[in-house]
Amino acid sequence: MTLLAWCVAWILDVVIGDPPHWPHPVRWIGRLIAVSQRVVRRICHSDRALRIGGGVMWLVVIGLTWGVAWGVLALAHGIHPWLGWLVEVWMIFTALAGRCLAQSAMAVARPLQAGDLAESRHKLSWIVGRDTSQLQPAQINRAVVETVAENTVDGIIAPLFFLLLGGAPLAMAYKAVNTLDSMVGYKHEKYRAIGMVSARLDDVANFLPARLSWLLLSLAAVLCREDGARALRTGWRDRYQHSSPNCAWPEATVAGALGIRLGGPNDYFGQRVEKPWIGDAVRDIAVDDISRTIRLMWVASSLALALFIGVRYWLVGAA
């Protein structure tokens, strides 16, 4: 039943994703983080105090998320096994973000294909932290491909990985780790101290999933009739071409698969950030590379699901 729950949750993510008005745990986690951050800032004033407070905030958010998820699941199973199974499916479904990611990427690609640069920039600003107001089509394409590649780890592979390690409650706890990083894990002066623990522990949580993405995306490239060998080579060669210890693994692999160049300088919070280039410009990046990256994401996602189901079946059987 557990493995069936995994498959049903994954299919639900593929088919319906995250309808905007449905209740979603990540929104609740986000509200908890916002309240916790206000409390920490009210109490802590020096950088040292903010770092400590940020660490306490991390423990509170992760602990509450895991505890509530475990408690709700245990209560549902206690009422009826089928209710417990349905709650498990719902938790796993909400931990995955494949369709949401694909829809967000195509929301940028469609106006770009129609020549509406302003609308494309606007939609891009919803999913990236960089300044999008002056971006040209090639830069927009690059930003979307990078976002889809990076979030293949955050939104699919890592949740499935933690689902394997500790079931739905640990997958939900991972979503809290990721949400903390997305809300406070910035190098900007406002967040550097309070978000230090969140940023570093997000790096720790994604360490193995990011490296798995190198293999999964390379195999996906073969299955999608992209250049799998170049994906494997470039992913390994450029794995450190990023300030994050994890982001370059999926980005470089996708860049190699498609024969394009990612990375480079960008503006964040009004500051110019120089980043190294990733991949080789075998050809110019194009808007079609967005849909090709989404295809790689879906195939890598299905491979990750199959891999983790296989590992769990080998360890404990079909239970």
Curated annotation (Swiss-Prot):
Q: Classify the protein's membrane topology as the record does.
A: Multi-pass membrane protein
**Which InterPro entries does this UniProt record tie to the protein?**
Cobalamin_biosynth_CobD/CbiB
Q: In which pathway does it act?
A: Cofactor biosynthesis; adenosylcobalamin biosynthesis
Sum up the protein's function in the record's words. Answer: Converts cobyric acid to cobinamide by the addition of aminopropanol on the F carboxylic group.
Q: Which UniProt keywords apply?
A: Cell membrane, Cobalamin biosynthesis, Membrane, Transmembrane, Transmembrane helix
Q: Give the signal peptide, or none.
A: none
Compartment(s) where it occurs, according to its Swiss-Prot or TrEMBL record: Cell membrane
Family indicated by similarity: Belongs to the CobD/CbiB family.
Record has Cell inner membrane as a keyword:
no
NCBIfam families, A to Z: cobal_cbiB
Listed transmembrane segments: 56-76, 78-98, 153-173, 204-224, 296-316
Give the GO molecular function terms: ABC-type vitamin B12 transporter activity; threonine-phosphate decarboxylase activity
According to UniProt, the name of this protein is Cobalamin biosynthesis protein CobD
Source domain of life: Bacteria
